[in-house]
Structure formats: structure tokens, C-alpha cells
Amino acid sequence: DYDTLRKVNPGLVMLHVSGYGQTGPYSERPGVGTLAEAFSGYAHVTGEPDGPPTLPSFPLADGVAALTGTYAVLAALWARDRNGGIGDEIDISLYEPLLSMTGPMLINFTKGGVVSNREGNRARWSTPRNTYKTKDNRWIAVSSAADSPAMRLFQAIGREDLTTNPAWATNRERLKRVDECDNMIA
């Protein structure tokens, strides 16, 4: 354990990564990335609005926990080198780093009881934002919350008229026409 090893090397930095952390009510439970993606709420907000919660097809929780752990170890090494050579023990669960990705959704739920729903490739704060099939049967991803990229997109699809139309000039106005925007681009 860390306390034993620290006696031999006071500068030791040790990282633990587990499903639910080293302490707490779930600490003894086995944990894998898929469970973390569900437990964190990530799967609940991913997928199409009328579909089931969707898990990523790649090890998202594992990768995010690895990046978080790497950052934590680097920060602990930096602190150790500046604060007298004393190491640290770091505890990261697979699910907690995913909470930072769900950010406002978690806060909206815990503070206001608002449950976020699945939105597919859309975002309630930006339009156009989606994936669209092209005429040559390929797919493109578009995200134009800022007005200038949206105007360039409208020009690219032959809808220059929208670049001077106040109903399409700002993201706020475009959000009133999400379905129309998607249908026009698709």
C-alpha cells in the first residue's frame, strides 16, 4: 500500500484507477468503462431523442480516466518538486472524469431537477450542428454556433439569400428554426 511504500520513498507519486474509487459505498464493486459510461449519465444523454441511451463504441471512460490520471500525476510531480520532495497518492474512478464532460447537465439536475434528454447530433445551444449526408453519399459534420461560419455554409450550399436575412443572421435566431435549418442543409 501507499503508506508502506512512502516510508521507503517519500517522493513516491502513486495513481489508483478503479471503477468507483478507493473509498465510498461502491469502492468494492467491480467497475469497467461501460458501467462508468452508464453510471456517469453519459449514456443517458447520448443517442437519438426517440432512441435508447447509447454507449460509445470505443473505450471512452478508460481513455478519459487515463488522461485525467496523467494530468494528476504530472501535477503531483510538479508539486513534489517544488514543495520539499513529498509525493502524493491519487485516486481516480472511471466514472468521475466523465462527469466533467456532462458538466452543465449534472449541475442542472442536482440544482434544478432538470433531466437532460438525448439530442442526437444536435446541440440545444447551436445550429447548424449535425451530421449531413452529401450528394455523393458521404457524411460531413457541421458545427456553426458562430455566425460567420454559418454564413459561409449558407453561401456554400447556394443559399446566399440567408446571409442578409435577419431571421438567419444570428445563432439565437437560427435556433428558432432548427428543423428548417437541418432540412435545408441535408
Where are these regions (language model features)?
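Aromatic-enriched alpha-helical interface/lid elements that frame and gate functional surfaces
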Residues: 128-186
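Active-site-adjacent "lid/gating" segments in soluble enzymes
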Residues: 1-145
